[in-house]
């Protein structure tokens, strides 16, 4: 990446593709290779996609030029997208306030409770002999554990998931339905009431503590944080549960290895998240002219940073299209990088390690349903399997 403001555009050829035509639904390896092969900057559907490792990592580390706020805070929306749609120094404050609640030390205190819920959820499935893993587990599991930590009632889980699904569907439709609008309103009303209740009657949960600490978040900030976590904060675990169980169903030798050596589950989880991140790109908007891959992007250019393409770019032995199970946890960028690196990465790893370990404990051998062909929902902002039918005896 060239220094911002330098102009070396010259005669640059800008590839133009249609996002929906990329072969992502069946094979992300082929899809991201198609994009990388097209060029370092590819224009699709109004966005400039950066596909090369050097450029993606430089942009992730430079929020001054590649702004999250301009990309993620909807104009005119009074609800702040905390902390995602803020750049330093505002983002630095949010990170400082929130980080302690998602640190390994804090999560270790919650581990017994999270483990109990994990065991119970898989136990409810194990006796069936079959399940549709996305609907029966992947969509529910991260929500249930989130509610435990965050301080929302467990009995509201399914209602919150329903609202979340409706609001996300609304964002993908050109014209929202009355039901979509009603769901969005009901979710906001629910969260407003819960934030106010925790402010009046605080407990040990995250929702209470962020409102009463040394530097408490305001009511509107907590509402924005809660709204973001419900709508977009849990997709990584949902997607990774599905892809983890898919790979384990395909690979009996891998199942046996992880049962015999549970410490390798962490390696497996890192590889699943590297290969199949639910949020494969990071949106940004440039704040000043910047030259990338030979092209000068003017200020105000909408950009998407393709972390998933970087994770599979073949630049080293660990950045391949295959699981690398060599006993080591290799670095990747599925959780982003720079100041906006995923705040919940430790929680995601913990949840996935618990789930895979307990699944193999209760359901050691299982297989895919006959004639099943895995596909993700595409085009979509979040990559996850449409469904995952499993069976066992």
What do these predicted regions represent?
Residues 1-393:
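Cytochrome P450
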């Amino acid at each position: 990446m060239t220094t911002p403001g330098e102009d070396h555009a010259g005669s640059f050829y800008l590839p133009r593709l249609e996002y929906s035509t990329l072969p992502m639904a069946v094979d992300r390896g082929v899809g991201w290779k198609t994009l990388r092969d097209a060029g370092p900057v590819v224009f699709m559907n109004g966005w400039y996609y950066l596909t090369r490792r050097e450029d993606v990592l430089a942009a992730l580390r430079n929020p001054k030029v590649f702004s999250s706020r301009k990309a993620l805070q909807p104009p005119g929306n009074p609800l702040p997208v905390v902390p995602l749609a803020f750049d330093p120094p505002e983002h630095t404050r949010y990170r400082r306030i929130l980080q302690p609640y998602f640190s390994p030390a804090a999560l270790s205190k919650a581990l017994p409770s999270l483990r109990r819920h994990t065991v119970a959820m898989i136990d409810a499935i194990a006796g069936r002999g079959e399940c549709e893993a996305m609907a029966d587990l992947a969509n529910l599991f991260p929500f249930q554990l989130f509610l435990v930590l965050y301080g929302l009632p467990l009995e509201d889980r399914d209602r919150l998931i329903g609202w979340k699904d409706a609001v996300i569907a609304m964002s993908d439709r050109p014209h929202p339905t009355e039901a979509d609008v009603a769901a969005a309103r009901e979710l906001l009303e629910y969260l407003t009431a819960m934030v106010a209740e925790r402010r009046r009657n605080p407990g040990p949960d995250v929702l209470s503590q962020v409102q009463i600490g040394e530097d408490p978040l305001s009511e509107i900030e907590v509402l924005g944080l809660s709204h973001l976590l419900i709508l977009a904060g849990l997709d990584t675990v949902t997607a990774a549960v599905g892809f983890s169980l898919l790979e384990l169903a395909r690979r009996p030798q891998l199942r046996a290895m992880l049962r015999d050596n549970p410490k390798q589950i962490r390696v497996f989880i890192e590889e699943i998240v590297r290969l199949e991140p639910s949020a494969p790109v990071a949106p940004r908007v440039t704040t000043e002219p910047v030259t990338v891959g030979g092209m000068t992007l003017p200020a105000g250019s909408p950009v998407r940073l393709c972390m998933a393409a970087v994770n599979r770019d073949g630049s080293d032995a660990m950045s391949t299209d295959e699981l690398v199970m060599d006993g080591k946890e290799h670095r990747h960028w599925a959780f982003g990088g720079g100041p906006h690196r995923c705040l919940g990465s430790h929680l995601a790893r913990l949840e996935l390690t618990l789930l895979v370990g307990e699944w193999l404990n209760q359901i050691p051998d299982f297989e895919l349903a006959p004639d099943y062909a895995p596909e993700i929902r595409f085009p979509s902002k979040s990559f996850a399997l449409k469904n995952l039918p499993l069976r066992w005896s």
